[in-house]
């Protein structure tokens, strides 16, 4: 974002705005950051950059709470993963457990046997 330092935030792309939001939050040096749909509307190339930054910050001790419907992103970023449906927690586990649990499959795909 260095080359865009003087650009008004409203002129940035969706992905650039997400990176700017993350940078603004980091100024306060938080220990926990909530990300609500961090990849929504973001160019896939910038999603990769965003993921790299999140992983790097997590390794430095920053905790992230991620609300996301993109399961590929969730699987790559989060451990543990908590799955909610209709406002209720239905599962907590690692990516493999979440991926194969019938309650999760039913919550997101419906009864596939029907």
Residue ranges and their predicted role:
Residues 8-12:
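Conserved ABC ATPase signature
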